[in-house]
């Protein structure tokens, strides 16, 4: 962040802020994740994703699926979001 950005109050992009938050959550939870127990943060993550996406697109809660699985030494966070078909543009 540059000096002028600091003075002028330029904000970070929403996507980069969300990415940083997700990385922090994953790093924190990674150390405490044991076995196949579902982490406590997944329902909150799903609700927050729903809130953010609903600002731009009309979707249902069932359209977002969040799943965490462990593969060998890796943990994979799988997020599937089903977006509606775009509305046809009006003919001129």
Swiss-Prot record:
Belongs to the MinE family. Prevents the cell division inhibition by proteins MinC and MinD at internal division sites while permitting inhibition at polar sites. This ensures cell division at the proper site by restricting the formation of a division septum at the midpoint of the long axis of the cell. Coiled coil: none annotated. Keywords: Cell cycle, Cell division. The gene is minE. GO terms for biological process: cell division; regulation of division septum assembly. It comes from Variovorax paradoxus (strain S110). This is Cell division topological specificity factor. Pfam families: MinE.
């Amino acid at each position: 962040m540059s000096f002028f950005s600091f003075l002028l109050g330029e904000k970070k992009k929403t996507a980069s802020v969300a990415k940083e938050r997700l990385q922090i959550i994953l790093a924190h939870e990674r150390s405490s994740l044991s076995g196949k127990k579902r982490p406590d943060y997944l329902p909150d993550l799903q609700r927050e994703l729903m809130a953010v996406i609903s600002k731009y697109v009309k979707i249902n809660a069932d359209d977002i699926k969040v799943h965490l699985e462990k593969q060998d030494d890796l943990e994979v966070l799988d997020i599937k979001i089903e977006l509606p078909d775009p509305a046809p543009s009006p003919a001129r």
